[in-house]
């Protein structure tokens, strides 16, 4: 896992798609915030990476251990996959979701309704990433709701849930007697 870069303010972990249309303005907003930020963005344009990789932003070419990284992060920025969003919330971290597809958009709506983060819909032109990041950093209600989620599901064991699902599927596949 890479070391966090120097910077001011909360630590951001960004898990991003290289094809995200708002990637350049998002990275510009993150750079302007000077928050220490770790970014995983497979396939990012080398020129874009070079422009922002520096004092407060560090890019990783390799996938990072999210379970080890999240306890050190303060805010998560992602596109809203179910797994990434669930991991962030189970770690008690507020999230900025930037969906690129319908499923992620629906997850974003639920997250915003619950109050554990903010989202910017894909059709928003001139998205104000800076204001969203500032709100997540300065308004404690988002972190409080994320911690509420983490506390509520503290007993969640992924392996136990998977075993239960497999057992139910196997039972459903058994011929009726």
Question: What are the functions of these language-model segments?
Answer:
Residues 1-75:
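Donor-nucleotide binding loops and adjacent catalytic segments primarily
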Residues 63-110:
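A donor-sugar binding/catalytic signature common to diverse glycosyltransferases
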Residues 128-177:
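C-terminal amphipathic helix plus adjacent low-complexity
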């Amino acid at each position: 896992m890479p070391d966090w870069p120097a910077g001011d303010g909360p630590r951001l972990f960004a898990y991003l798609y290289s094809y995200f249309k708002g990637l350049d303005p998002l990275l510009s907003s993150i750079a302007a915030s000077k928050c220490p930020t770790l970014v995983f963005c497979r396939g990012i344009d080398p020129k874009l990476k070079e422009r922002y990789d520096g004092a407060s932003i560090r890019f990783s070419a390799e996938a990072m251990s999210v379970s080890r990284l999240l306890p050190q992060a303060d805010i998560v920025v992602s596109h809203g996959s179910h797994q990434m969003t669930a991991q962030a919330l189970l770690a008690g971290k507020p999230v900025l979701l930037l969906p690129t597809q319908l499923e992620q958009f629906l997850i974003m709506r639920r997250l915003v309704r619950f109050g554990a983060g903010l989202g910017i819909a894909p059709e928003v032109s001139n998205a104000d990433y800076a204001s969203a990041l500032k709100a997540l950093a300065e308004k404690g209600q988002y972190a409080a709701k994320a911690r509420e989620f983490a506390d509520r599901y503290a007993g969640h064991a992924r392996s136990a849930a998977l075993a239960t699902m497999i057992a139910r599927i196997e039972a459903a596949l058994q011929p009726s007697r």
